[in-house]
Amino acid sequence: MIRVNDLNESLKFYCDALGMKLLRKHDYPNGEFTLAFVGYEDEDSHTVVELTHNWGTKSYDQGSAFGHLAVGVDDLYATCAALKEKGVKVVREPGPMKFGGPHIAFVEDPTGYKVELIQTNTVHS
C-alpha cells in the first residue's frame, strides 16, 4: 500500500501512463479515506498496488525505509520515450545497471514515489 496525495493524478499515472487497470475503488466516508487497487491482471492471481488517499492530507513523509516499486517492460527505451510524451518525470534515464545487469530506468509518480522500469529481456537468471 502506498499513500497518495491526489488519487485522480495517481490513477492517471498508474493506469493511463503505466497501463495498469483500475481493478476496484471504494470510498470510506466514516474513515475519510479512499482505497483504489490497480494492476495489470486480475487481483486473484496477480500482484496489485493498493493506493490509499486520506481525505484532507496534502502530503506524506515518505521516510527512508521504502525504496521503490518495479515493473518489467518489453522495450525500456520506447517506454521511457512514451512516458516522457505523457509528461511523466524520468529521474534516471534508461541504460544498463551499474556493474552490469539489466537495463533499467526510474520514473516518479505524482506523489514522488519512484518506479523502476526493467527491460525484461536483459534480466539474468
Write out the residue ranges for each language-model feature.
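Vicinal oxygen chelate
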Residues: L23-D27, T34-F37, V71-S125
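Short, charged/polar surface micro-motifs in flexible loops or helix N-caps
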Residues: D42-S45, G56-K58, L76
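Core segments of cupin and vicinal oxygen chelate
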Residues: M1-H46
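Short glycine-enriched loop/turn motifs at secondary-structure junctions
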Residues: D61-F66, K98-F99
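A general structural signal for stabilizing positions within well-ordered secondary structure
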Residues: Y14, Y60, F106-D109
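Short, charged/polar, Gly/Pro-enriched secondary-structure boundary elements
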Residues: E43-T47, G112-V115
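N-terminal beta-strand motif that seeds the catalytic metal site of vicinal oxygen chelate
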Residues: M1-L11, K21, F66-V71, I118-S125
